[in-house]
Amino acid sequence: MADAAPADVKKLSFERAMEELETIVKRLEDGKVPLEESVAIYERGEALKRRCEELLRQAEARVDKITTDAQGQPVGTEPLDVQ
């Protein structure tokens, strides 16, 4: 898993990237991984984190807030302001 090429991270779904990231975190937290391997899987974890953030930003950009009129009836959508 951790020895997969960095380029393939860009092809992973959010769910798959998150699953792999969680596995890496568990392995690092266990503290039983040799130093060189720890560094390699940490770097992979960083790439996976960036992929998840990218996919979340893309999903966020696609989410719209439904706007309503005075009677509460839906009349359209506008970009969701998540701040």
Curated annotation (Swiss-Prot):
One of its GO terms (biological process) is DNA catabolic process. Its main location: cytoplasm. InterPro entries: Exonuc_VII_S, Exonuc_VII_ssu_sf. Heterooligomer composed of large and small subunits. The keyword Hydrolase applies. This is Exodeoxyribonuclease 7 small subunit. It comes from Rhodopseudomonas palustris (strain HaA2). Belongs to the XseB family. It is found in: Cytoplasm. It catalyses: Exonucleolytic cleavage in either 5'- to 3'- or 3'- to 5'-direction to yield nucleoside 5'-phosphates. Gene3D superfamilies: Exonuclease VII, small subunit (1.10.287.1040). GO terms for cellular component: cytosol; exodeoxyribonuclease VII complex. Keywords: Cytoplasm, Exonuclease, Hydrolase, Nuclease. The gene is xseB. Its EC number is 3.1.11.6. The keyword rRNA processing does not apply. It comes from the Bacteria. GO terms for molecular function: exodeoxyribonuclease VII activity. Bidirectionally degrades single-stranded DNA into large acid-insoluble oligonucleotides, which are then degraded further into small acid-soluble oligonucleotides.
